[in-house]
């Protein structure tokens, strides 16, 4: 029986063509043992990527280029493995697998310790594998009990939202810097490179419990789970273990399964304490995979489809203290650990540990590291290797402009010439890149704004007050042009009330011109507002009562009585006291007028200013005139 093309829908037609062998097979479809169809252009990219991968494998076999796994071992990234070295090596040679590492947002910033398991992910991405970073928005509500005798204090909902938002954008910034580092080191990005920052709340918030229990619970035996050291120690020596803590490694394993079947993530990389969770995760993925009830969706097992993983070593400094903890943690948030302090932290590393840190925390080729250590050994007092380490780490965490600027600032402060092998220090080209960060640039929840502003003023004024716009009119334009975004639950409607806001699953929706009272629909837990402009300019704002705001003594841009009027009165006071000359006051006024200039096509009439501002302006101009010509004030002359 034949069918005409018009008698079936497009989806069925594609399915029939695929089943008939008329279409190619994707990477994940091969893993599942079924075919999917792609268009000819997309298929050409897949074919080229596969050909490039096979060519790369041949070069590795011939010894022309180094195997990525061998590089991991050489640089010291590998501690314990789930799967043998040879199995992992063969898998990475023949298959473009994906790898991930997970981070629970239990604190508002990543620290140097988090960077170590991220480095192999970054390396794999540069070598053509998929690199994923997972934020545990769901698992953070439970808390990882590994190596703990006392349960974690539950996070407040607003704290979790703040932590999740800040870490998400720290990871995005890190990935942008990784792209920059790849270009520096001569890696040519191709179509097959894949990376992502994901949040496990995305699937846990819609996952039926019965599916987890049926596909996972039936086959996971209690004996092995109870025999884990974490469980035994917490139950015998600690405060006991809750059921939610007991299921934490299973939740982590399900995360892996979700990315395994959806994205081909076959490897997990974790910190030195995560080996037990990785082993449980391997077992979880296999169990859920084998319990797939739909034969069409079932993924075959075998060495080339089984999950693998490894842990990175525990780093300690020369004093035996856990790395990053010796003098307070070295945070990746520049408002908790400044670029200068982070640079200084690595400059202070001992000669005994600097070579190991260069291998672990930089993308420098081994020959460059060996050459730097040779130069360093000739005169250790110059700390050449330490400066190279500090420069590279700051470049990875904050970008290369920050690395150059910080090294030059360090040189200027201590008056010593800095020699960094292979680097010619330069000042950043753009003037704005040399400007110290403002507190308004920090995505901190202690950025507070009063309730009267959040609930009673336009969104344009809120953007101005939050430092995302230079004026209220610019904030208005951002809202009109949908150039700024507000934190909301995926699919959130402005007509809904704030009860639908989920504090562990956040997306951003474009800001529009809405009524002031509608801003309340975006408050998280009734007091937290998250705004964004561009890719990484984030404001996490806590709404406080007007009384609390007044007592704090803070002001915000555009606050009544604190803007132009305050500036005019300050200028008048300083002019009368002789602290400023008339010319300096004029220059300040000119700069202020330029900053507050209306947008093109918008006419601002003088009488739109308040009477107090017009009067203060006149008083200031009279005082300038008096200072310039001397004698009585113009007002007194006119009265006479």
UniProtKB/Swiss-Prot annotation:
GO terms for biological process: mRNA processing; tyrosyl-tRNA aminoacylation. ATP binds at residues 104, 325. The lineage of its organism: Eukaryota, Fungi, Dikarya, Ascomycota, Pezizomycotina. GO terms for cellular component: cytosol; mitochondrial matrix. GO terms for molecular function: ATP binding; RNA binding; tyrosine-tRNA ligase activity. Has both an aminoacyl-tRNA synthetase activity and is involved in the splicing of group I introns. L-tyrosine binds at residues 100, 144, 248, 252, 255, 274. Keywords: Aminoacyl-tRNA synthetase, ATP-binding, Ligase, Mitochondrion, mRNA processing, Nucleotide-binding, Protein biosynthesis, Transit peptide. It catalyses: tRNA(Tyr) + L-tyrosine + ATP = L-tyrosyl-tRNA(Tyr) + AMP + diphosphate + H(+). Its main location: mitochondrion. It is an enzyme of class 6 (ligase). A motif ('HIGH' region) lies at residues 105-114. SUPFAM superfamilies: Nucleotidylyl transferase (SSF52374). Its EC number is 6.1.1.1. A motif ('KMSKS' region) lies at residues 322-326. NCBIfam families: tyrS. It is found in: Mitochondrion matrix. This is Tyrosine--tRNA ligase, mitochondrial. It holds the Pfam family TyrRSs_C. Belongs to the class-I aminoacyl-tRNA synthetase family.
């Amino acid at each position: 029986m034949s069918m005409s093309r018009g008698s079936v829908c497009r989806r069925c037609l594609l399915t029939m063509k695929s089943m008939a062998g008329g279409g190619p097979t994707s990477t994940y479809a091969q893993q599942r043992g079924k075919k999917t169809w792609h268009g000819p252009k997309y298929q050409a990219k897949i074919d080229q990527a596969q050909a490039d991968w096979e060519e790369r494998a041949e070069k590795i076999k011939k010894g022309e280029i180094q195997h990525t796994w061998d590089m991991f071992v050489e640089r010291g990234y590998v501690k314990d493995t789930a799967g043998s070295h040879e199995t992992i090596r063969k898998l990475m040679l023949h298959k473009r697998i994906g790898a991930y590492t997970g981070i629970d947002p239990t604190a508002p910033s990543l620290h140097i310790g988090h960077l170590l398991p991220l480095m192999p992910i970054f390396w794999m991405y540069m070598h053509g594998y998929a690199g994923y970073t997972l934020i545990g928005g769901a698992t953070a509500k439970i808390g990882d009990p590994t190596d703990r005798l006392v349960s974690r204090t539950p996070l407040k909902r607003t704290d979790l939202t703040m932590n999740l938002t800040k870490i998400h954008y720290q990871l995005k910034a890190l990935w942008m810097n990784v792209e920059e580092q790849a270009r520096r080191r001569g890696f040519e990005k191709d179509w097959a490179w894949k990376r992502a920052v994901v949040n496990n709340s995305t699937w846990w918030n819609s996952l039926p419990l019965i599916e987890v229990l049926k596909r996972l619970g039936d086959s996971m035996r209690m004996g092995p789970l109870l025999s884990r050291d974490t469980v035994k120690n917490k139950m015998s020596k600690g405060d006991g273990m809750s059921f939610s803590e007991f299921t934490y490694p299973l939740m982590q394993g399900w995360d892996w399964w979700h990315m395994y079947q959806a994205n081909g993530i076959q490897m997990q990389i974790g910190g030195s304490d995560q080996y037990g969770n990785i082993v449980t995760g391997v077992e979880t993925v296999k169990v859920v995979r084998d319990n797939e009830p739909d034969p069409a969706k079932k993924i075959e097992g075998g060495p080339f489809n089984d999950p693998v993983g490894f842990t990175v070593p525990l780093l300690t400094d020369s004093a035996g203290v856990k790395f990053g903890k010796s003098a307070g943690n070295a945070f990746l948030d520049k408002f908790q650990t400044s670029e200068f302090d982070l640079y200084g932290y690595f400059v202070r590393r001992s000669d005994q540990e600097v070579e190991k840190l260069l291998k672990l925390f930089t993308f420098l080729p081994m020959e460059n590291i060996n050459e730097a250590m040779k130069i360093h050994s000739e005169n250790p007092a110059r700390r050449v290797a330490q400066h190279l380490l500090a420069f590279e780490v700051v470049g990875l965490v904050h970008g290369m402009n920050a690395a150059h600027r910080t090294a030059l600032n360090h040189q200027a402060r201590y008056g010593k010439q800095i020699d960094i092998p292979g680097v010619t220090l330069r000042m950043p080209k753009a003037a704005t890149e040399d400007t110290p960060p403002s507190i308004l640039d920090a995505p901190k929840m202690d950025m507070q704004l009063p309730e009267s502003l959040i609930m009673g003023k336009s969104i344009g004024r809120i953007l101005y007050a939050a430092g995302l716009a230079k004026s209220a009119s610019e904030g208005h334009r951002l809202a009109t042009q949908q150039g700024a975004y507000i934190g909301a639950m995926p699919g959130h409607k402005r007509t809904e009330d704030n009860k639908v806001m989920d504090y562990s699953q956040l997306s951003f929706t474009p800001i529009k011109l809405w009524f002031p009272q509608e801003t309340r629909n975006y408050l998280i837990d009734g007091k937290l507002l998250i705004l964004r402009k561009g890719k990484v300019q984030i404001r996490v704002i806590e709404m406080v009562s007007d009384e609390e705001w007044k007592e704090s003594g803070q002001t915000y841009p555009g606050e009544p009585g604190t803007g132009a009027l305050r500036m005019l009165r300050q200028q008048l006071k300083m002019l009368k006291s002789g602290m400023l000359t008339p010319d300096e006051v004029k220059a300040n006024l000119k700069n202020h007028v330029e900053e507050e200039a209306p947008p093109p096509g918008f006419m601002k009439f003088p009488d739109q200013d308040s009477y107090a501002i017009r009067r203060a302006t006149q008083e200031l101009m009279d005082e300038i005139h008096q200072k310039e010509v001397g004698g009585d004030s113009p007002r007194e002359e006119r009265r006479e």
